[in-house]
Regions:
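Short, solvent-exposed loop/turn segments at the edges of extracellular beta-sandwich modules
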Residues: 82-88, 183-191, 287-292
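Proline-enriched interdomain boundary motifs that mark the N-terminal boundary
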Residues: 2-10, 102-112, 205-215, 306-314
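Short, solvent-exposed loop/linker segments at the N-terminal edge
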Residues: 14-21, 115-123, 218-226, 318-325
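Low-complexity "stalk/linker" and mucin-like segments enriched in Ser/Thr/Pro/Ala/Gly
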Residues: 40-59, 139-160, 242-265, 341-349
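C-terminal edge beta-strand
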Residues: 1, 89-100, 190-203, 292-304
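Extracellular/luminal low-complexity segments enriched in Ser/Thr/Pro
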Residues: 60-71, 161-172, 266-276
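A short beta-strand segment in extracellular, disulfide-stabilized domains
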Residues: 21-28, 123-130, 226-233, 324-333
Length: 349
C-alpha cells in the first residue's frame, strides 16, 4: 500500500489584508484521498473536508480571509490527508495566514463639525478624527489647493485635528473643502484605505464704509438749512442697515430722511428744528445681512439756531426836538446772536 504523503512547494506563511483571498497553495497527495482542512482561531468557511476524485493527486487551498478583523490576527491552518488506513499517518501540514485589518477613520468631535459654517475672524469648532485598525496615519489636503488662512491641521498620535480662526477678509461666502485619507498597513497596496471629506464655509464680515466726504459724517449746519448728504456703502456680508437717532444726544431731528438704494445708504434733508440754542443730534447706523456680527457707524449733526434780536421798548421810531434826549431804544439778543454791529443809514448821524 502506498504511504499517506502530503506535500507542497508553496509558501506556508502568508500575509494578507482583511476581505481578500490568501495566496493559493497547491498540495500533492499520495496514498489517501480524504483531505480535512481546519483553522485556529476558527473560521467557519475555512473548515472543509475534501474527497479527491479517482486519479486526482493534487488540490489547491485558496480561501477568503475574514472581513471583520480589527487587529492583526494570525490564523494557523492544518491540512490532513487520510484514506489508507494500512499505512502510517504522515499526511499533515500546517501553515499560517496573518490577516491585517483594513483602515478605519472616525469623526470623534461633535456630529456636524466636519461640515460647518463660521464667520470671518471667528474660531472654528475643532474637527477631530481618529484612526484605528489598520490605519496609523493621515494624508490631508485642501481641495483645489484652496486654503483658508488661519485654519491649521495637525496630528497627535492617532488623532487628527483641524482648528483655528478664519482670518481671511473675504468679500463673499467661500467654501473650503478638505479630504483626509488614512495611511498605515498596506500589503501589496491591497489593504483598503478610508477617505473622509468635509467643508468649512467662511462668511464675510458685514462691512459699511463712508462714501461721502469725511466731513459729512459729523457736520454743523444752521436750522432750516440742508445738511451735506451723507452716504455709506454696504459690502461683503452686509445687505441692509437700520437707522436710529442716538438717545445719548438731543433727540430726533426733523426733516432728515434716510434710506437704502441698492448697496448705498443715504442720509439727507433739511434740518427742521426750531431751537433757541445749539443742539447736537447723533445717529447710529447698524448693518444687517448674513449671520455674522453687525457693524455700527455713528455720526452727528449739530444744528445752530438763527440769530434773533427783539425790541424790548415801543419807541424804535420817535421824533424829538434838537438838543432834547431821545427815549432809550432797547433790543435783546437771543438764540444764535451773541453780538451786534450798528450803523446809521445813509451815513446820516
Amino acid at each position: 500500500y502506498p504511504s499517506n504523503v502530503l506535500s507542497t512547494t508553496g509558501d506556508l506563511t502568508d500575509e494578507v489584508c482583511a476581505n481578500n483571498s490568501m495566496t493559493p497553495i497547491e498540495f500533492s497527495a499520495e496514498g489517501g484521498n480524504s483531505i480535512s482542512i481546519s483553522v485556529s482561531p476558527s473560521i467557519a468557511l475555512f473548515n472543509e473536508n475534501i474527497t479527491l476524485a479517482a486519479g486526482t493527486t493534487t488540490f489547491t487551498l485558496n480561501k477568503n480571509v475574514p472581513t471583520n478583523v480589527t487587529t492583526t490576527t494570525v490564523y494557523t491552518y492544518t491540512v490532513t490527508l487520510t484514506g489508507n488506513a494500512n499505512c502510517p499517518a504522515a499526511g499533515t501540514i500546517t501553515g499560517t495566514i496573518t490577516v491585517n485589518p483594513n483602515h478605519n477613520i472616525t469623526l470623534i468631535s461633535a456630529i456636524g463639525t466636519d461640515s460647518q459654517t463660521i464667520c470671518y475672524n471667528t474660531g472654528l469648532t475643532s474637527i477631530t478624527y481618529q484612526v484605528d485598525q489598520g490605519a496609523s496615519g493621515f494624508d490631508f489636503s485642501w481641495d483645489n489647493n484652496l486654503i483658508p488662512p488661519g485654519i491649521t491641521h495637525a496630528v497627535s498620535g492617532t488623532t487628527y485635528t483641524i482648528s483655528g480662526t478664519a482670518t481671511s477678509d473675504i468679500s463673499v461666502a467661500t467654501n473650503y473643502s478638505y479630504t483626509v485619507t488614512t495611511t498605515g498597513i498596506a500589503i501589496g497596496n491591497i489593504c483598503a484605505t478610508e477617505t473622509v471629506t468635509g467643508s468649512i464655509t467662511v462668511l464675510p464680515r458685514q462691512a459699511i464704509t463712508l462714501a461721502s466726504a469725511s466731513t459729512t459724517e459729523s457736520q454743523t449746519i444752521c436750522e432750516q438749512t440742508s445738511i451735506a448728504t451723507i452716504t455709506y456703502n454696504l459690502s461683503k456680508g452686509a445687505t441692509g442697515a437700520t437707522f436710529s437717532w442716538d438717545p445719548a444726544y438731543d433727540g430726533t431731528l426733523g426733516g432728515i430722511t434716510f434710506g437704502l438704494n441698492g448697496s448705498t445708504y443715504t442720509i439727507s434733508g433739511t434740518a427742521n428744528a426750531n431751537i433757541t440754542s445749539s443742539k447736537t443730534y447723533g445717529y447710529i447706523l447698524t448693518t444687517n445681512g448674513n449671520t455674522c456680527s453687525s457693524t455700527t457707524v455713528t455720526g452727528t449733526i449739530t444744528v445752530l439756531p438763527d440769530d434773533k434780536i427783539t425790541l424790548n421798548t415801543a419807541n424804535e421810531t420817535q421824533s424829538v426836538c434838537e438838543s432834547t434826549p431821545i427815549d432809550d431804544v432797547v433790543y435783546t439778543l437771543s438764540e444764535g446772536a451773541t453780538g451786534y454791529s450798528f450803523s446809521w443809514d445813509n451815513n446820516s448821524i
